[in-house]
Amino acid sequence: MMKFTVAKKAIALTGAVAMLGSVAACGSDTASGKPAQDKDVTEITVWAWEPTLTQVAKDFTKKTGIKVDLKNVGTNTKEYTQLDNAIEAGSGAPDVAQVEYYAIPQYAIKGNLLDITDKTSGYSDFYTPGPWASVQFAGKVYGLPMDSGPMAFFYNKEVFDKAGVDAEQIKTWDQYYDAAKKIHALGDNYYITSDTGDAGFFDSMTWLAGAKPFQTSSDGSEVTVNLTEDKGVKTFTDFWQKLLDEGLLDTKTAGWSEDWFKGMVDGTIASLFTGAWMPANLANSAADGAGKWRVTQMPTADGSTTNSENGGSSLAVLASTKKADAAYQFIEYANHGDGVATRVAGGAFPADKASMESDSFKNTTTVKNADGEDVDYFGGQKYNEVLAQAAENVSSDYQFLPYEVKARTIFGDYLGKSYTGDQKLTDGIAAWQKALQDYGKDQGFTVK
């Protein structure tokens, strides 16, 4: 991997700005969706795994005449590995890539993404706060939000009722702890939730607790990694350690496994703290749980209504593209134009305010499964109404590391034993912090 230096970053970003100049010079009318005037810009390559983009790409081609070669080269880290290889090789990179919010800083700071700041004036009014903040780094915009993942509390009402717990009244983590004890009392195999050590979940929960363990200077040269002394990190780890110590969490069932979804159906995994994109996953992979589940707002340490994000992606133009105009037209269409409605109709959770506030979205009571069938998964609840409020509650001041992809990749190496009872969370966090600091220094950052 290429080491980062301020000089290299400056050169890379200068190139990105120059490329953006060529975008403006092309003079295409992206708002009207007119085809690009440059004869050579007839086809763009897009790497993405979001299924609703298939129809969006077809509609975009029909409207603009620009062909889209849409490729799924793997989800999240699998795509990023291929992207890194192509960037390092100097060839083979796409024109547009789906980049999750946590990965934006890592690619922006190395100059791999096109700076589209001057194309997006006023866009903050279009998007919800969390996603809009997440496509920015050091005051610049590097992508357009595609979806969002405000955290929400999904729960099996049937199990909670059996345990005598009203999930709607759980506002604090102390109340959640009390509920965890009551649910586990139903049987040794009943747990309020599961966690085998998930870096994204850890980030979301510490964010929810007000943590700010990672900071990057405006020029991208200095990074602060302060997990061990951050109050928000301590608040969450103290809470979670208590549940681990008392055996109130399922630490054996891996997330996204067949057994995980089975647990949601039979009630042995009674709830989830996860992103608002979860309904379709439940309808498809835990189909027999239909009618049993509901969703409510996240409980917090102090009972406040603040919230955090879990997941969510952007579409970003690669700085190396020679088809910047067409590439930008596509992300504009998909995430700021007609493609937004197409994606929401296909089941995507929106990142824009208009979709989130529309009656048709808020009044939805069914979830579309993979066969396109409407499933009454949440027992008639207007679940999007809850999720839209969750999005409004997101605090947008959390920062990811400029090497967040690496940080999440090695999370389990240092904290895995914390979930098996072989060490405390604090021990794993201290070791992870040192590894992150050492890695940052090795990449050329000044680390504090």
Q: What are the roles of these predicted feature ranges?
A:
Residues 1-43, 427, 437-448:
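Short, low-complexity disordered leader/linker segments with a strong preference
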Residues 38-51, 66-71, 95-96, 142:
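Short, well-ordered beta-strand elements
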Residues 59-129, 162-164, 261-271, 426:
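Extracytoplasmic "Venus flytrap"/periplasmic binding protein-like
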Residues 93-95, 124-159, 191, 304-307, ...:
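A structural signal for short loop-to-beta-strand junctions that line the ligand-binding cleft
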Residues 101-151, 205-207, 292-296, 376, ...:
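Hinge/lid segment of periplasmic solute-binding proteins
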Residues 161, 245, 386-448:
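Conserved C-terminal helix/tail region of periplasmic/extracytoplasmic solute-binding proteins
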Residues 180, 222-253, 298:
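Glycine-centered hinge/linker elements that transmit conformational signals in sensory
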Residues 278-289, 303-409, 447:
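C-terminal lobe and pocket-closing loops
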